[in-house]
C-alpha cells in the first residue's frame, strides 16, 4: 500500500555520493516543497569514485572533472542543502533527530527529520597488523585520498609501489602507476586477482598484468610493514619482505555502519544494514542505500554485499520514490561489472561457476573463443567467454568475458538475458545487430547459445580442464588432438596423439570404437567437428571446453603462481 506523503516533509540524507546524491535529486523532482538536507563527511559530493585511479595516473588531468556536482551547483539546480565536512555522529530514532559535527568549526548540533536516508558507503578494510599507520601507506576511497596520493607522488617521485589487494581498485591503480613509470607489485593472500571471476578466467587477467610489467605475488600473506631505507618493507609470512617507496592498501571495503549499529538498526552479513525491497530498514522512517546495505543476489536469492555504483544509484532512486509516496521495489543485484586492464577488458555478470557450486547449484559451463567481429574484416580480436548455466533447467546464471574488443557489448547482452530470466539455450535466438566491423552474423552470444543447445540436445558432450589430469593414460581411453601437425609440435597435453581434423575420416581405422574418445583442438571448434565425425561413425566422444589455448593459458599461470618467487617479484 502506498503511504500518504507530506509536501512539506523534511528529509535528511547521510552521505552525498552515489546513492545519497541520487536520492536527493529524485526527491526534489518528485516533491518541490520538501526540505532536503545532505550531510557529507568529506569535502566533496557526487564525485566519480571510479575515476580516482585515473587522476593519479594523469589520464584525467583536471581535478574538477572528478566532481560531478558541487554543493553550490546542486543547490542551484535542486534546492538541496548540501553540507560538506559535516559528520553525523549519532541517530536518535525516537526523537527523529541526528547529531551532527561541523568538522571545520567543531560545532555540534541536532538536526530533525521526517525521513532519514543512510548512504554512508563503505570504508577501506584496514588489516590489524603492525605498521598500518606509516606515512608511506595509503588507502584510496575518497577525493581527499586521491589528492593525498597524487601530492605524494608529485613531491617524492617514488620509483616503486606495492599494492596490497587485487580487486578493482588494486588493478586500476597498478595500471596507472605503471603508466607513470613505477615498478609495481601486487601482493595478496588469494591465488587469483578479481574474485568475481573464476580462477581459470582470472588467468588471462594475470597474463595481461605480467605482460605490462606488473609483478604478482599471489598466495602470500602480508603480516606487517616496517620503514627502511626511506621506503617500506612489506613483511610476508614465510617469505622475504618486499621493499617499495610506497604502499597502497586495496584489500577491499567494509560497510560503514557504525551509525546504524549504534541506532539499533538490524544488521546482516559483515555488519551491513538489513533492508527490505523498498530500501526500508528495521526502524520506521529510516531508509538505507548503497555499499552499506545487504541485498538479495538476483541469481541465487541469497543475501549479498555488492559494492557497485549502479546498484547504489538504483537504490537511491527507489528509496526516494517510496519516501514520496510511490511503491518502488529493488529486485536484487547481479554484480555486473567491467574493468580496463591496460589493453584488455574484463567483465562479468551474475554468478561465477565457483560461487554457484558453493550455493549448491548443479551447473555446467561452455567456454569459447570467438572473434570480436567478422574474421575477414581487419582488426578483429579474440575474446574468451565463459557462460554458466544450471544443468537441470538450463537457466542462465552468469558469464565472464576477457578480450580486447567488444567485451562490454557482450556482457551487457548477457546481463540483460539473466535479468529477463532467459535460459542459456535461448541465447541463440537473440536478434543482435550485425555488420562486419562490429560483429559476426553469428554473434559470440549466439554462439554460446548454440553450444548450450547442442548440450541440451545431446549433440555435444564436454570434458573440462579439471578432468585433464584425471584422464587415464593406460590406453583405456583415446586422447586425441585434432590440430595441425605444426600446432601439435608447438605444445600439447601429455598422453594425447595427433590426427588433424581434416585427415580424421581417412584415419578412423587408427581408433578403437570400444574406447571413449577425448578430443581437443586450439579453440574448441575443430574438436567439435571431429566429435561429430566420430559420433557419426559410432564413437563415444567428448569435446574439451575452451581448447588448448585456454588450457595453456590457465596451466602456465598456475605454474607461475606456485613458483617459489612468485612471478619474479623483487626481494628486499
Regions found by a protein language model. Give the residues of each.
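Rossmann-like dinucleotide-binding cores of NAD(P)H-dependent redox enzymes
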Residues: 67, 160-161, 168-226, 306-312, ...
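A Rossmann-like FAD-binding core segment of flavoenzymes
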Residues: 33-35, 77, 83-104, 111, ...
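Rhodanese-like catalytic fold shared by cysteine-dependent sulfurtransferases
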Residues: 425-477, 485-516, 522-572
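Mid-to-C-terminal Rossmann-like scaffold of FAD/NAD(P)H-dependent oxidoreductases
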Residues: 4-9, 16, 292-404, 436-440, ...
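N-terminal Rossmann-like dinucleotide/flavin-binding domain of flavoprotein oxidoreductases
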Residues: 26-115, 198-215, 220, 353-358, ...
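FAD-site-proximal beta/loop scaffold in flavoenzymes
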Residues: 133-157, 233-235, 241-318, 413, ...
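Beta1-alpha1 glycine-rich phosphate/pyrophosphate-binding loop at the start
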Residues: 5-85, 174-197, 336, 409-418, ...
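Glycine-rich dinucleotide-binding loop and its adjacent helix/turn
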Residues: 118-180, 215, 269, 275-277, ...
Amino acid at each position: 500500500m502506498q503511504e500518504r506523503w507530506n509536501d512539506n516533509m523534511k528529509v535528511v540524507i547521510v552521505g552525498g555520493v552515489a546513492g545519497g546524491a541520487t536520492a536527493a535529486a529524485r526527491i526534489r523532482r518528485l516533491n518541490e516543497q520538501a526540505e532536503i538536507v545532505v550531510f557529507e563527511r568529506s569535502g566533496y559530493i557526487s564525485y566519480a569514485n571510479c575515476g580516482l585511479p585515473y587522476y593519479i595516473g594523469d589520464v584525467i588531468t583536471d581535478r574538477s572533472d572528478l566532481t560531478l556536482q558541487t554543493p553550490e551547483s546542486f543547490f542551484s539546480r535542486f534546492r538541496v542543502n548540501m553540507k560538506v565536512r559535516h559528520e553525523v555522529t549519532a541517530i536518535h530514532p525516537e526523537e527523529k533527530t541526528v547529531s551532527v559535527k561541523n568538522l571545520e568549526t567543531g560545532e555540534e548540533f541536532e538536526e530533525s527529520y521526517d525521513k532519514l536516508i543512510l548512504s554512508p558507503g563503505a570504508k577501506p578494510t584496514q588489516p590489524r597488523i603492525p605498521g598500518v599507520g606509516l606515512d608511506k601507506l595509503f588507502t584510496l576511497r575518497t577525493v581527499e585520498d586521491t589528492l593525498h596520493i597524487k601530492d605524494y607522488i608529485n613531491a617524492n617521485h617514488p620509483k616503486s609501489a606495492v599494492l596490497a589487494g587485487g580487486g578493482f581498485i588494486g588493478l586500476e591503480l597498478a595500471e596507472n602507476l605503471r603508466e607513470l613509470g613505477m615498478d609495481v607489485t601486487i601482493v595478496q593472500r588469494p591465488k587469483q586477482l578479481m574474485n568475481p571471476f573464476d580462477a581459470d578466467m582470472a588467468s588471462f587477467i594475470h597474463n595481461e598484468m605480467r605482460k605490462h610489467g606488473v609483478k604478482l605475488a599471489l598466495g602470500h600473506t602480508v603480516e606487517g610493514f616496517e620503514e627502511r631505507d626511506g621506503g617500506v618493507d612489506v613483511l610476508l609470512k614465510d617469505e622475504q619482505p618486499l621493499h617499495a617507496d610506497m604502499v597502497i592498501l586495496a584489500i577491499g571495503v567494509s560497510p560503514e555502519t557504525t551509525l546504524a549499529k549504534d541506532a539499533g538498526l538490524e544488521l546482516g552479513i559483515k555488519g551491513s544494514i538489513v533492508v527490505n525491497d523498498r530500501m526500508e530498514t528495521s526502524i520506521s522512517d529510516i531508509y538505507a542505500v548503497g555499499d552499506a546495505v545487504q541485498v538479495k543476489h538476483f541469481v541465487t536469492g541469497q543475501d549479498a554485499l555488492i559494492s557497485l555504483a549502479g546498484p547504489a544509484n538504483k537504490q537511491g532512486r527507489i528509496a526516494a520514490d517510496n519516501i514520496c509516496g510511490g511503491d518502488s521495489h529493488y529486485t536484487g543485484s547481479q554484480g555486473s561489472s567491467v574493468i580496463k586492464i591496460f589493453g584488455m577488458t574484463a567483465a562479468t555478470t551474475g554468478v561465477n561457476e565457483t560461487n554457484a557450486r558453493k550455493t549448491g547449484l548443479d551447473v555446467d559451463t561452455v567456454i569459447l573463443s570467438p572473434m570480436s567481429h567478422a574474421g575477414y574484416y581487419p582488426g578483429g580480436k579474440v575474446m574468451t567467454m565463459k557462460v554458466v548455466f544450471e544443468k537441470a533447467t538450463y537457466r542462465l546464471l552468469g558469464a565472464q568475458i576477457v578480450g580486447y574488443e567488444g567485451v562490454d557489448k557482450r556482457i551487457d547482452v548477457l546481463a540483460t538475458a539473466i535479468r529477463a530470466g532467459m535460459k542459456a539455450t535461448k541465447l541463440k535466438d537473440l536478434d543482435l545487430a550485425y555488420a562486419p566491423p562490429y560483429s559476426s552474423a553469428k554473434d559470440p552470444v549466439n554462439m554460446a547459445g548454440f553450444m548450450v543447445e547442442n548440450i541440451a540436445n545431446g549433440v555435444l558432450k564436454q570434458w573440462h580442464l579439471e578432468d585433464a589430469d584425471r584422464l587415464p593414460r593406460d590406453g583405456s581411453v583415446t586422447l586425441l588432438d585434432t590440430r595441425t601437425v605444426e600446432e601439435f609440435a608447438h605444445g600439447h597435453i601429455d598422453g594425447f596423439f595427433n590426427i588433424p581434423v581434416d585427415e580424421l575420416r581417412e584415419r578412423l581405422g587408427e581408433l578403437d570404437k570400444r574406447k571413449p574418445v577425448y578430443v581437443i583442438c586450439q579453440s574448441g571448434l575443430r574438436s567439435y567437428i571431429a566429435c561429430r565425425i566420430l559420433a557419426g561413425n559410432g564413437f563415444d566422444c567428448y569435446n574439451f571446453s575452451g581448447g588448448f589455448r585456454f588450457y595453456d593459458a590457465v596451466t602456465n599461470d598456475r605454474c607461475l603462481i606456485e613458483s617459489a618467487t612468485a612471478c619474479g617479484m623483487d626481494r628486499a
